Amino acid sequence: MATEAAFTTQVPEKDQVTYFCLGIGKFLSLSLKFSNFIRMYWSWCDSLLHFPVNELNKNPVEGFSAGLIDDNDLYRWEVLIIGPPDTLYEGGVFKAHLTFPKDYPLRPPKMKFITEIWHPNVDKNGDVCISILHEPGEDKYGYEKPEERWLPIHTVETIMISVISMLADPNGDSPANVDAAKEWREDRNGEFKRKVARCVRKSQETAFE
């Protein structure tokens, strides 16, 4: 039977922390070969993505829809986000991709808008920059609390709720698109509004291409 000391020699220290966080690593090391544990771990990660995609298809959530880009790849999703009512983004149908890391849910997915969107917290390449999608732990710049960043309890639904909230209430203090943030602060009902309206119209034209 393997001992805890044997586990320590087989697994790098950084990985010990990861598996301990799962709450099962050291227990499984007593009865499983490390390679078998890794296979079980990846299977567990897959199941965490397989269930929500089925659940969202059966019970859609207002404001967005989600599905796999490729039925054979659980780690790449496509989402359609409806611009929230009573905001400048109302009426928009914005397409985005979620790309999950292999060690999800320990680390967050990346989100990228495919539809053009003008927003302070979305950079010009479409990458979304909000706290919930930032790597877990302390913010070295001190802008975010650990509990505001990624936690393994978050789901696709909580991510999308945060993104919809971001559309309704941009964070101009921590922008990914500095030009959009400047316009949002200084000319919200002028140039910023015109650029958003153009993106909304374009999103409607290309939503189902």
Language-model features: where?
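UBC/E2-like fold recognition across ubiquitin and ubiquitin-like conjugation systems
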Residues: M1-V93, H97-E209
